[in-house]
Amino acid sequence: MASEGRLYEVSFDADGCGATKAATAAVAEMIDGAPVLDAALIDIDTVDAAIGGLTPAKRHAAQLATDALHRALQGVASSSLSLIPPSQSGGVATSPAADGCHAPQHRVAVAMSGGVDSAVAALLAREEGAEVVGVTVKLWTDPETDGAKACCSPEAVLGARALAHQLGIPHFTLDLEEDFRRRVVDRFIGGYTAGTTPNPCILCNGEVRLAAMIDLAERVGAERLLTGHYARIVVDGVGPLLAAAADKAKDQSYMLAALPPELLGRLGFPLTELTKPEVREIAARHGLAVARKAESQDLCFLAGQGKRGFLRRHGGLRERDGAIVDSAGRTLGRHRGHHDFTVGQRRGIGVSAPEALYVLATDATANTVTVGTRAELEKRSVRVRDVVLHRDGSAVDAVKLRYRSRALPATVSAAGKGRHPSLDVDLGEAFPGVAPGQTAVLMAGEQIVGHGTIAA
């Protein structure tokens, strides 16, 4: 039981060898009456030392006891309870800090994924004198995925916890699987079912994980949540806005575009001015094993498996014969399901032609895929739905239509700050591959002033 930041009436049910029972008993004794933050610091070595040292063959007992403790702490963290004594309650800051700086001895929470970026964010915060608390979210469990490649899998949680303890900081896990399934995965499946190409990472960042971690940051008495994203926060006369990071090759502001402005004041990005090679060098200099860890290229719930298999298993989208047609409706070939294709796709279409063909559109109802030339693919205007503008539409001078694409010169139809059912975005140059379902990020220079979902 947790109350006023401490653990009480602690007990463990342990089956197995004597070492396992001794390890769990030691954990129960250590944490009964202890502050929750102290319990979150306990790792395998702590348990090992508490029972006088285990032989290598018995060290698994300390692992089992530690895992049981942190599963229990996950339940506490995933509740609405405050995890600190009332005297320490301060809450997160409401003023933005682009670099995540803070006064010495201030407490910050750091979102830790188990990768090098978040590890260095935590390291930099600690070196600046902050009391750091690590937070990891568990979003998806699927035996068919490669947990080692997923950022929010049970395996990633263990890796993040080990990194936090290596840095000497407490660690908590938030279980958001149910919310993630409902608000992200189900909409991902629904998008492909309807013939669009959704962007689940923007949904997750904007609606699920960061808000939950900011809430936990407040409950552990942290002034703000720091993350390892490459992005910047700037402040104008109205308030905070997202902007591009110094490392344009790694800039992740597009993926954060759906964050409400009120959350930006509670976030910090310590890597704003750093490049990826610099981050890896910092990690290597401090002996972190993740310094050379490869980056995941998959969506967290697709790691190690293909999109087709995932949609079949979780969305019931199975192979269904359909026609590949040109813009005049002539049949050029066959396919096995419209959901295997996205607008702008060139490879894997399965149709031979004198010049390269691209996917122009998919029709879920007719189960057809329309292909054509690059010239047919190009667009000079885009209809965007469910638009949120943080500034007046007249401020928009560019738009980004895909994560890895550059921002294009653009203007929007007259619109004031706020929400709009739809807006037309006129492009200053033709863009090939405007995919319905993707996010259109509206920009003023390098600042993000709005976003919406591409409709056509």
Report the location of each language-model feature.
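Generic secondary-structure signature for well-ordered alpha-helical cores
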Residues: 32, 36, 52, 56, ...
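ATP-dependent adenylation/nucleotidyltransferase module used to activate substrates
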Residues: 93-257, 277-278, 284
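Generic structural signal for well-ordered, non-membrane alpha-helical segments
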Residues: 16, 20, 40, 58-62, ...
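Alpha-helical scaffold segments in soluble metabolic enzymes
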Residues: 26-29, 64-71, 212, 278-285, ...
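Domain-level signature for proteins that mediate thiol-based redox and metal-cofactor handling
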Residues: 1-83, 90, 94, 98-108
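Generic structural signal for well-ordered alpha-helical scaffold segments
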Residues: 2, 73, 214-218, 312
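AMP-forming adenylation/ATP pyrophosphatase catalytic core
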Residues: 113-116, 226-233, 238-456
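Conserved short-loop catalytic and cofactor-binding motifs
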Residues: 11, 15, 53, 148, ...
